[in-house]
Each structure stands twice: as structure tokens, then as C-alpha cells.
Amino acid sequence: MSQAAGVEDVPPFDRSFLTSGCTFTRIGSGPLGGKASGLLTISRGLARLFHPEAFPSFAVDVPRLTVLGADAFGVFLRENGLFDVALSGAPDQVIADAFQRGSLPAHLVGDLRALTEEMRRPLAVRSSSLLEDARDLPLAGVYLTKMLPNNQPDADARFRRLSEAVKLVYASTYFRAARAYRAAAGAGDDEERMAVIFQEVVGRRHGDRFYPHVSGVARSWAWYRTGRTRPEDGVAQLALGLGKQIVDGGLSWVFSPARPKARPPFASARASLKETQTEFWAVNMGRPPAHDPTRETEYLVRAGLPEAEFDGTLGRIASTYDAASDRLLPGIAREGPRVLDFAPILVHDSLPLNGLVRALLLACEGCLGGPVEIEFALTFEPGGGVRFALLQSRLMAVSQQLVEVGEDPPPGWKALVTSRDAMGNGSTEGIADVVWVERRGWEMRRSAEAAAAIAALNRRLVSEGRPYVLIGFGRWGSADPWLGIPVAWGDIAGARAIVEASPPERGIEVSQGSHFFHNLAGFRVGYLSVPAGREGDVDWGWLEARAGAESIGPVRHARLEQPLLVEVDGRSGRGMILRREETT
């Protein structure tokens, strides 16, 4: 099925669909959008390519969902006179407020109201645009998803919250990050239309929190990977709670499906206390927060590992740190700090999760016709069963260009950046702009200031059609400003090589944001990491000597007379950003 498949291929929404046995229904007309089309293809193809009897420990499914066809998007804009503000370049909040004042098409209200009357579990209201999840134009993570508790006693209140969420997803089509992304990709705003997915949130309720025991992302091919693995080995990430922890670039457990028991890249077991997940996301099922329909996280809460242990959700996925031996002991039977390393599952084989993930990656490749990325959630059911829900599957862009990066630069070139932990694959030339965070006096508390300056420079360089190299400290795209610079993808969409240097004050593991790396792959962006102790692998002196460099807060921008060359060898993990030798 094509990415632009119509909703006519899906049965119409039945107002008793919870008991109808139908798992995929539609409201309205028009295309499904990329995300929904991919899910429909997978849900139909798994019956042919996946053999669940090989994994009797699991109940595998694609969660029940309903799609609001993309035609409603155009009707909503037209009937409410929103085209002018949508295309005005106004701030996100102005656009969001204008969309909230609009009314959804009257002919769809009955089905949407019935959806909230029938469905009393938490709902995810997700984007599914025409351009989203395309192999060559992946808008992963650019548009918004809103989670709703959907537990208000009043059906009218549930319907109002659903309507607000739809309008927020619609508005995000024209937010700054989305516009910048499309501009960098050469796609016009008039090419985009938005369908919307309503999907049950997978998880279980624990007091006022609703969340899955495990969320995960896995990729069958990994130019963007970690550890001593081959690209074809793929890579996977696991986290406690909602998958937002992973896709926002938060700390998660990263491993190769080919080597799930490999030792983590930490200097010691004690180091894992700082480099593994300590907080998780959940849907707030308790007292409603202050009403704010334009905030994506309005109904989400964050909690720590003590709360998870109280909920009883750590026992099968965590280990305990033993200070006396500097070791991690599987499980939580002993006293001590908890570490989310998923060792009971991955190392001690209490559940064949890794085998299931590998089988599903293979099946999804067969369905979609190439390397894939999947998102999933797992819950341990009260009766002893385990539910594995496949939430998303998308094609990945994979470069097969052959590049060899040696120890030394080729003749006539000098190394601006050298990395032994580079991600991506390929060669990019003709980059005549470089944007970097100044090293002297840098402190991570200035991350938000740096992010704003970089976003401003990115907008200008994208509008001028000038790709650039971006160099900074910590994890690009991290939601935690103490771990990295909190940019969204649209803030850096014009970069064609990104360098992640360890902050002067402490080392930080390489960034792992799922949607972030999907976009890197789609744009063929090289991602070069320079760890602590290898500060000399960035020629800071040459950067600081650029006469006439523009300054915006802690960020510098220089336009070069001689373009840079970026080379990344995906198989060896080596990369270089090269500058021409200067003649005197």
C-alpha cells in the first residue's frame, strides 16, 4: 500500500467498534497519511510473515485505532479561515491559539463524540501527515502527539479534550520546526496535509499513573548505532514508561539485537547510576492539571524509579547496584540503588524479548520492502501473560555509498574534526558555513541560550540555501539541558554534519534520540562524536581564529572561502570533517 492510500481501503468507524472485532477503522474521507498507511500495511502483512506460535510467551498485536482522513484537515482550515495565519510564519503559540478557536467539521462530530463515548481507556492523538514517515522525506518527530487520560465522567468533557487534541495536531503542521524541516527538504507548505490517528495508549494503571512496563525502538539497519556492531546487526533501545523517553532523546538502554548480553560502555558499574534512565513518563489519571489545550504534555507526568518500585513495575527489568563489589545484581530483591539495565530480560533470558524483536524486524522488512524502524510497548498482565504492542513501523533511508576514512587526512587536507565514533555513511562536499558553540567559558547551564541562537542561525541559513557544519557540546536534541543542547529537529534541519563534543566539565554518552536519528538518516547527515579525553580531535584553535565570525551569545558562525568536506565510514565508525590546507 502506498503512503497516500485512501481511507476508502479501511472500513468506516462503527459506533460499537469496541465489540465489533474491527481493529482499524476510519472517520471521514481522504488519505490516511504516512504513519497510518504504514500501520495498516504492517497489521495486514504480519499475518503472512510473522509466526506468533514461535513466541508463546507473548500476545502480539497492533493496537486498535481509528483514522480521521486528511480531507477533514482542509475543510477545517477553510471553514475557520485559518489559511492566512497558518502560512503567516507567526509564532507557534499564535497559530495554536487560532486553531483552538476553530470548530471541527460538523459532519464528523457525531463519530468523534461516539469514539469518546465508547473508548474509556487513555488515547493517543497522533499525527499522520502525507509526508510523514516517507523514506526520502522522513518527518519523524516533527509533528505533535497528545496523550489523553480520557477518564472524565462526562462524555462531553471527553469529547472537548479530544477535539482540542485534534486541533493541536493540526496546528503543529505549521509550527516553526515543521516549516523549517520542510524548507530544508525542499518541500512546500502547500504539499502537506494532515490525517489524525486515535489509538489506545498501551499500558496499565498504577494509581494515578498509566504507562507500559517497557517501551522500545528497534532498527534493522544502523549506520547510526552504538558499540562494536555491524550496520546490519541493527540497534534497539528500551525504556520504562511511555516511549516519549526514547524519542525525546532521554536516557535509555541501548543494545544490539545481535549482541543483547554485551557489556555496556560504562567505565564501571557505578557509572551506570548516572548514565541510565532515572525518570519515566506516564499519563496522568489523577487530578486534572490547569487547562492548557496548546501544551503537548498537558496530561503527562514524570516520576522517578522509587515511584516505579512502589507501582511494582521494576522487578522484571531492573538491577541493583552493590557498592561493596561495584557490581550490578539482577533484580530488586536487595537493598541499593536501582539501575534500569533490563538485565533480567536481556542477559538472564527471563523473557525472549530480543528474539521477538528480531523476528518482527524481519517481518516488517518483508512488509515494507527495506530496512525498518519499529516502535513498541510491552506490559506484564495480571494473569501472567505479556502483551507486545507494535505501535509504528517505518522505512529507513540507508546510504550504500562506499567511503573509507583512514588515520590521516588525504593530501591537501587538514582535519577540522576527527571521530572514532561517527554515525551515518557517505561523503558530502561543498559546505562553506560552520556554526559552533564557543569552548572557552562554556557551561551546560547556557544550553537553552545556545539552542535559541542556533535555531535563529538555522532559519537564516536554510532560507539562503546554505548547508552548514554544526559543532557543540553534549547530546544534541536532549530534553534535559544539562545533558545537551535542547534543540528540536527543525532548529538544526539545515546542518549536513553534526559534531557532539563532550562538555569540558564531564563526559556524556552519545545521543540516542530515535526520531532524531531517523531524520539524520533521511537527510544523510553525518553525526560525529568526540568523547572526553579527545578534545584535540576538534581543531578549536582554527575555529577561534576565523576572522569576522558572527557571534550570537555563546554561538559563532563563520562563512568559509574554501568549502569543507565531510566523510563518514559507516562500517568502521570513523569520520572526518576536512578543511583545505592553507597556503602562505
Language model segments and positions:
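An acidic intrinsically disordered interaction segment
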Residues: 1-13
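An N-terminal structural lobe/cap that precedes and organizes the functional/catalytic core
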Residues: 52-62, 66
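Extended, well-ordered alpha-helical scaffold/bundle regions in very large, multi-domain proteins
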Residues: 64-69, 73-97
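A polyampholytic, Gly/Pro-enriched intrinsically disordered region
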Residues: 83-89, 375, 517-522
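Metal-assisted phosphate- and nucleotidyl-transfer catalytic regions
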Residues: 93-107
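Polybasic, proline/glycine-rich intrinsically disordered low-complexity segments
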Residues: 503-545
